[in-house]
Amino acid sequence: MKEIGALQAEYPLVNKLIATEEVFWINPNIEKYETAIKDSPLNEENVKDAEERLKRFAPYIAKVFPETKGANGIIESPLVKIPSMKEALERKYEQPILGELLLKCDSHLPISGSIKARGGIYEVLKHAEQLALQHGMVTEEDNYSVLDSDTCREFFSKYSIAVGSTGNLGLSIGIMSANLGFNVTVHMSADAKEWKKDLLRSKGVNVIEYEDDYSKAVEEGRRQADADPSCYFVDDENSHDLFLGYAVAASRLQKQLEELEVVVDENHPLFVYLPCGVGGGPGGVAFGLKLLYKDNVHCYFAEPTHSPCMLLGLMTGLHDKISVQDIGIDNVTDADGLAVGRPSGFVGKTMEPFLSGNYTVSDEELYRLLKELADTENIYLEPSALAGMIGPVKVCKEDEYLQKLQLTEKVKKGTHIVWGTGGSMVPNDTMDEYYRKGLELTI
């Protein structure tokens, strides 16, 4: 790896990252969709396959998780307009947001209350299906609700699943695996919130805590799983299945936009702002959206100023060969879901030609935005889920990207979607504390 001095000389923005200042970065390596997709390791067929698998499991999900019954076992979240928040942002930052502002409430996804309910649950279901088909427990033509039986739970109990997590992925995988009957272990990093660990333990999940950060928890989980042939490791850093589980969100979002009569085409661009940790969730969603909307969708990743791992990896082209700690950043943030020091190389390399840019936001700003959203729209998100909220302001303010792609006029007829990644499962007293912090920082 290059010396820090050489990186600073080649990429002046590194200086601001080191100073943990908020930055906005336009990806110089973005390509036209038709060029980018040619070299992509994944394609539309892979996403369709994931979508079909989730449909096969829908009867099982509806039976085991009654809260999904109304949607027939499809795990989906609302897409809502947030006009009062839009006004508040325009006032606060003295910057008009051109176009309409919507919030995708993955914070309110059933089962585990975060975006991780998409990829995490999908990967567990895929593994369960492979085992069940292999051992003649089901055929693809069966109604998968038959998996909710003592016989199947006993069968799955011979196998184990492990994952390393800062919190939300652990919740999704822990809850789903335990329901099916698997023995499940979640390796939690130091920044994981206590309530998330408690909730997992209450579901019979084995939680192992580490003093170290996320990368260490993943490494340890992987090592232990490798030693046990009956253990399946959900690898958040390299998993194609997690990524595809997230990508399915795009076609669901397309239907919701149609219901709201929101047009997305060359004259009506779509901008999407996704909080980013190791990269799987935002990468998968952005990839799915690119498959559908091609060059008419513009995706941005949002990271905490103390954990800008994906921005650092993409900007330097070093991907997972560099961590924020390598340039002296501490990777300590209250945005626990985004507290990742080293990005996924797979996601960074896959998304590099598709991504419009990255930006960072401070913890203090996340708390202020949390309070603002609660006040204006009565929607409560966890701190990390607010990282996307400042995106529309940044894109409209630093309009170099809009000018470059001749979008300065078109953006007025466009739509901005902030991806609210988690929050509905946060205990009330914890949420009150978050709100108080936002209030103190606003006064």
UniProtKB/Swiss-Prot annotation:
InterPro entries for this protein: D_Ser_am_lyase, Ser/Thr_Dehydratase, Ser/Thr_deHydtase_PyrdxlP-BS, TrpB-like_PALP, TrpB-like_PALP_sf
The protein's required cofactors: pyridoxal 5'-phosphate
One Pfam family from the record: PALP
Catalysed transformations (reactions): D-serine = pyruvate + NH4(+)
SUPFAM superfamilies named in the record: Tryptophan synthase beta subunit-like PLP-dependent enzymes (SSF53686)
CDD domains: D-Ser-dehyd
Signal peptide span: none
Enzyme class name: lyase
E.C. no: 4.3.1.18
Alphabetized UniProt keyword annotations: Lyase, Pyridoxal phosphate
GO-annotated biological processes: D-serine catabolic process
An example molecular function term from Gene Ontology annotations: hydro-lyase activity
N6-(pyridoxal phosphate)lysine: modified positions: 116
Family label: Belongs to the serine/threonine dehydratase family. DsdA subfamily.
Entry protein name: Probable D-serine dehydratase
Species: Bacillus cereus (strain ATCC 14579 / DSM 31 / CCUG 7414 / JCM 2152 / NBRC 15305 / NCIMB 9373 / NCTC 2599 / NRRL B-3711)
Gene: dsdA
